[in-house]
Design a protein with these regions (language model features):
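Glycine- and other small-residue-rich loops at beta-strand/loop junctions that grip anionic moieties
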Residues: 99, 123, 156
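N-terminal helical cap/lid subdomain that shapes the substrate entry/recognition surface
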Residues: 2-116, 132
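A structural preference for short, hydrophobic beta-strand core positions in alpha/beta folds
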Residues: 40, 122, 243-245
Length: 267
C-alpha cells in the first residue's frame, strides 16, 4: 500500500457548527425541562457518541444522578433513557439548522481531497433524520461528502468502529490503514483507532474549546494559544496521531501519512 484512499470527517465541531454548540443547546434544554441544570462542561463530557448513549452517560454523572433522584423520587433506568431520548430528538432538530454553518475551509479541503483522488466520508453521533437535515444544509453551502453514516445505520455509534468500517466497505478501500479519521472529540479519536485508521484531532473549532467563530476570533492571541494547547493535549492523550487546529490545515498531515505508508508504517 503506497497511498491514502479516503478521509472520514466528523460533523459538529469539525466541518459544521463551530464550537459544537447545537448538541449542547439541545441537551441542556432537555434536562432543564426536568428541573436539572446541566452545565456546558457536563453536556460536553461525552460529546460525539450516539445521543442515546450520551443521555445515559449524563444520567450516570453523580450530580445529575442525585438531582434525578430528588426530582423523580427514584433512580433512573432504561425507560427514562428512552423517554429522554425521544424528547431530545425534536429539541435537537429545532436548533440544528441554526447551527449548521459550514466551518471555514471545509469546502476547500474537500475539493483538494477530491483533486487528489481521495474519497470523503462522514460519521456522526446524530440520528438519521438529524444527519439528513445537516446534509441538506451543508450541500446548500457547497459541502457534499461522498458518504454519510450515523449510528442508526450500524446499530451503534462511537467509540465503536462500525460507522468508519461501513464507509471503508462502501468506498472499497484496500485497507483500513489507507483511511484517515478526523474529528474534534475523544470519541472521534477512539473511533478511528478502533477501526485501524489514522486518527487526526481538531482542536479549536470543536467541542474542546466550545466557542462560536465570532467568540473565538474575539479572544487575544495568547488566550487562543492557551485554549488550543489544552485541547491538543486532551486529543493527544486520547491517542490522536496528529492534531490540527481546523480541517483546512489537513493537507500537510496527509502528506506525512502518505510518506509513512510508503515506508511501510501503519497506524
Amino acid at each position: 500500500m503506497k497511498r491514502l484512499e479516503a478521509v472520514i470527517f466528523d460533523w459538529a465541531g469539525t466541518t459544521v457548527d463551530h464550537g459544537s454548540l447545537a448538541p449542547v443547546r439541545a441537551m441542556t434544554e432537555l434536562f432543564a425541562r426536568y428541573g436539572i441544570r446541566l452545565s456546558d462542561a457536563d453536556a460536553r463530557r461525552d460529546m460525539g457518541i450516539f445521543k442515546k448513549d450520551h443521555i445515559r452517560r449524563i444520567l450516570a454523572l453523580p450530580r445529575i444522578e442525585r438531582a434525578w433522584r430528588e426530582r423523580s423520587g427514584g433512580a433512573w433506568d432504561e425507560r427514562h433513557v428512552q423517554m429522554l431520548f425521544e424528547e431530545f430528538q425534536p429539541l435537537q432538530m429545532e436548533v440544528l439548522e441554526a447551527f449548521s454553518q459550514v466551518i471555514g475551509g471545509t469546502v476547500e479541503i474537500t475539493e483538494r481531497l477530491h483533486g487528489r483522488g481521495l474519497k470523503v466520508g462522514s460519521t456522526t453521533g446524530y440520528t438519521r433524520p438529524m444527519l439528513d437535515a445537516l446534509l441538506r444544509c451543508a450541500a446548500a453551502q457547497g459541502y457534499r461528502p461522498d458518504a454519510a453514516v450515523c449510528p442508526d445505520d450500524t446499530g451503534g455509534g462511537r467509540p465503536r468502529p462500525w460507522m468508519c468500517l461501513r464507509i471503508a466497505l462502501e468506498f472499497r478501500v484496500g485497507a483500513a490503514a489507507a483511511v484517515v479519521k478526523v474529528g474534534d472529540t475523544e470519541s472521534d479519536i477512539m473511533e478511528g483507532l478502533n477501526a485501524g485508521m489514522w486518527s487526526v484531532g481538531v482542536s479549536t473549532t470543536g467541542n474542546e474549546v466550545g466557542m462560536s467563530a465570532a467568540d473565538w476570533e474575539a479572544l487575544r492571541d495568547e488566550e487562543r494559544a492557551g485554549l488550543a494547547a489544552k485541547a491538543c493535549a486532551k486529543l493527544r492523550a486520547a491517542g490522536a496521531h496528529y492534531v490540527i487546529e481546523r480541517v483546512s490545515l489537513l493537507d500537510r498531515v496527509l502528506e506525512e501519512i502518505d510518506a509513512r505508508l510508503a515506508a511501510g508504517e501503519r497506524p
